[in-house]
From Swiss-Prot:
PROSITE patterns: WD_REPEATS_2, WD_REPEATS_REGION. This is Probable cytosolic iron-sulfur protein assembly protein CIAO1 homolog. Belongs to the WD repeat CIA1 family. Pfam families: WD40 (PF00400). WD repeats lie at residues 157-196, 202-241, 246-281, 282-320, 327-366, 418-457, 469-506. HAMAP family: ciao1 (MF_03037). It comes from the Eukaryota. Essential component of the cytosolic iron-sulfur (Fe/S) protein assembly machinery. Required for the maturation of extramitochondrial Fe/S proteins. It comes from Monosiga brevicollis. GO terms for cellular component: cytosolic [4Fe-4S] assembly targeting complex.
């Protein structure tokens, strides 16, 4: 089978097939109509290794072009001398990790073949954005793993502590992840919860975090074995169609964007490739991220006590940090947006719940109705691009949320004195706006907004309920979406002692 492939750093014409050279610290390679002959990979590896050993590389650039499976697996990944040579450089800006090269083809594809030209980051604590479209193009996983169908007796629970729970977009299925290295899908039949299927894929470590794609056709699972598995819904159940590899340490979390085009993962690696983007603003470990519910705005929180917001730069499509919140005095463990994206809730080590709201530039104190240069609502996307002089409202149901890319976020409410230990999780009910928090004191607490001061637009919150769902630390919680009954709300919680789904009266 013929494979045409080109790796380059300029538009300069390169030598023929199998040629290698360096110029000004940059490596140039050319492979055109490379045929998968058994002896060729070793010859190419020797030639490339010799070239690298006589050169000092300050920058190695890789293009979008798909690389031959055979070349990668036999030449790059199996040749130890080549792997060693690729780790050599006179500076630390661009290094190809020997560890990465010793892993599978999937690792190199997922890390190097992004939609734009990328290099390694020297940051220790970073976020990574994968493009779901790239996963389809490059077919990162060539081995599909199907689900195992379990019985419907509701007894197919996890065999280890449950780390995360996430509802599907429709609210019909609840996914849970565990230290038993499985993901389980649950649904309600009458008054019982039944395990629909158990997803046992290639991951060999605790599955720490889950995230559903926009329509529920994809489910991403992040594991302590340094991989992220993306499951795709098929006719016979969910299948693992992509495995994102290459992290040197555990993947702490994963989150789909609202558009479904991006997957964010966070971890603490020593050196990382940039995929769609590396967001290296935090100075310490990233604990959680949250995508804005209607646009590609990403928020992250960290051990460095800050919350940061990122968006794509419209001029060059690079992802930039557009705002930083530094009013937390300790680790921020979890963040979440409300249903329309106008507010963000944050909890952390200081046992405090904080609520932030977005305000336009020039309005640091807030106002009853912040005036923006654009209006954002699902039915009004990309419609207004200049200043608003007049606003006319119709009587159709729904909420129109003023929004702008250069909004600044301000803390408008601080709730303290409720939890007695660190708060690890928070979630906003999309229908009732009730905030649920949980943490190390084993107690779930529910908060509701009671009043808004018209001069500053700052709300007050009151505790409306609390209960103990577990006997050990709570790791996560999630409200079920799309519940027509506003009086009875489903809330899933997970802890070291298992999974619990409760029906709570609002």
């Amino acid at each position: 089978m013929a494979c045409s492939c080109l790796l380059m750093a300029s538009m300069q014409t390169l030598p023929g097939p199998g040629a290698f050279r360096t110029e000004n610290g940059t490596l140039y390679l050319a492979f055109q109509e490379y045929y998968e002959a058994p002896q060729d990979p070793h010859n190419m590896a020797d030639a490339l290794s010799q070239t690298l050993s006589n050169s000092s590389l300050s920058q190695t650039l890789l293009s979008q072009t798909l690389i031959s499976h055979t070349f990668l697996s036999q030449t790059l990944l199996s040749n130890s001398s080549l792997s060693h040579s690729l780790t050599l450089s006179q500076n630390s800006q661009t290094l190809l990790s020997q560890t990465l090269l010793s892993q599978t083809l999937l690792s190199l594809l997922s890390l190097t073949l992004s939609h734009s030209l990328k290099t390694l980051s020297n940051s220790f604590f970073s976020l990574k954005l994968f493009s779901l479209k790239l996963l389809d193009v490059f077919s990162l996983s060539h081995t599909r793993t199907s689900t195992r169908e379990d019985g419907g007796d509701g007894q197919d629970g996890h065999e280890d502590r449950v780390w995360d729970v996430k509802w599907s977009p429709t609210g019909a299925v609840l996914a849970s992840s565990s230290g038993d290295q499985t993901v389980r899908l649950w649904t309600r039949e009458a008054r019982d919860w039944v395990c629909l299927s158990t997803l046992e894929g290639p991951q060999k470590g605790t599955i720490r975090s889950l995230s559903w794609g926009r329509e529920g056709n994809y489910l991403a699972a992040a594991s302590f074995d340094s991989t992220t598995c993306v499951w795709e819904k098929g006719p016979s159940g969910f299948e693992c169609f992509a495995t994102l590899e290459g992290h040197e340490n555990e993947v702490k979390g994963v989150a789909f964007s609202a558009s479904g085009d991006y997957i964010a993962t966070w971890f603490a690696d020593e050196e990382e490739f940039d995929c769609a983007a590396i967001l290296a603003e935090h100075s310490q470990d990233v604990k959680a991220v949250a995508w804005h519910p209607t646009r590609d705005l990403l928020a992250s929180c960290s051990y460095d006590n800050t919350i940061r917001f990122y968006r794509a730069d419209p001029d060059n499509a690079d992802w930039i940090c557009c705002d930083t919140l530094s009013d937390n005095q300790s680790t921020v463990w979890k963040i979440c947006f409300n249903a329309d994206g106008s507010r963000l809730a944050a909890v952390g080590d200081d046992r405090t719940l904080r609520v932030y709201q977005a305000f336009p530039p020039g309005n640091p104190q807030g106002a009853a109705l912040p005036a923006h240069s654009s209006i954002y609502a699902p039915c009004l996307r990309n419609t207004l691009h200049s200043a608003i002089n007049r606003l006319v409202c119709s009587d159709f149901a729904g909420i129109v949320t003023p929004s702008a890319s250069d909004d600044k976020w301000k803390c408008i409410a601080t709730i303290t004195g409720q939890h007695t230990r660190p708060i690890y999780s928070v979630d906003w009910d999309p229908e009732t706006n009730i905030l649920a928090t949980a943490g190390g004191d084993n107690i779930v607490r529910l908060f509701r907004e009671t009043a808004v001061q018209p001069d500053t637009n700052t709300p007050s919150y009151e505790l409306i309920g609390q209960f103990q769902a577990h006997d050990q630390d709570l790791n996560g919680l999630a409200w079920a979406p799309n519940q027509p009954d506003l009086q009875h709300r489903l809330l899933a919680t997970c802890a070291d002692d298992g999974l619990h789904v409760g029906n709570h009266k609002s």
